[in-house]
Amino acid sequence: MKESVIEKTAMVFGQMNEPPGARMRVALTGLTLAEYFRDVEGQDVLLFIDNIFRFTQAGSEVSALLGRMPSAVGYQPTL
């Protein structure tokens, strides 16, 4: 049985021109999808997050917008 990889692929995209809140949620959305396929569907999952720097940079920008120091509590709790 030959199956295409694309049929078993879920992709979530976030661009650098999007607001920081949206960029910060992209990695968490991908993780949520991976957990769903693993826990609910019972499938094996391989999760890739390309350029994790975008995710951490967005977290710093959100902290700045909220008026908090990005490093006030150390690393972001989401890392």
Swiss-Prot record:
GO terms for cellular component: plasma membrane; proton-transporting ATP synthase complex. It catalyses: ATP + H2O + 4 H(+)(in) = ADP + phosphate + 5 H(+)(out). The keyword Transmembrane does not apply. It is an enzyme of class 7 (translocase). It is found in: Cell membrane. Keywords: ATP synthesis, ATP-binding, Cell membrane, CF(1), Hydrogen ion transport, Ion transport, Membrane, Nucleotide-binding, Translocase, Transport. Transmembrane segments: none annotated. Its main location: membrane. SUPFAM superfamilies: P-loop containing nucleoside triphosphate hydrolases. Its EC number is 7.1.2.2. F-type ATPases have 2 components, CF(1) - the catalytic core - and CF(0) - the membrane proton channel. CF(1) has five subunits: alpha(3), beta(3), gamma(1), delta(1), epsilon(1). CF(0) has three main subunits: a(1), b(2) and c(9-12). The alpha and beta chains form an alternating ring which encloses part of the gamma chain. CF(1) is attached to CF(0) by a central stalk formed by the gamma and epsilon chains, while a peripheral stalk is formed by the delta and b chains. Belongs to the ATPase alpha/beta chains family. Produces ATP from ADP in the presence of a proton gradient across the membrane. The catalytic sites are hosted primarily by the beta subunits. PANTHER family: ATP SYNTHASE, ATP SYNTHASE SUBUNIT BETA, MITOCHONDRIAL. This is ATP synthase subunit beta. It comes from Streptococcus downei.
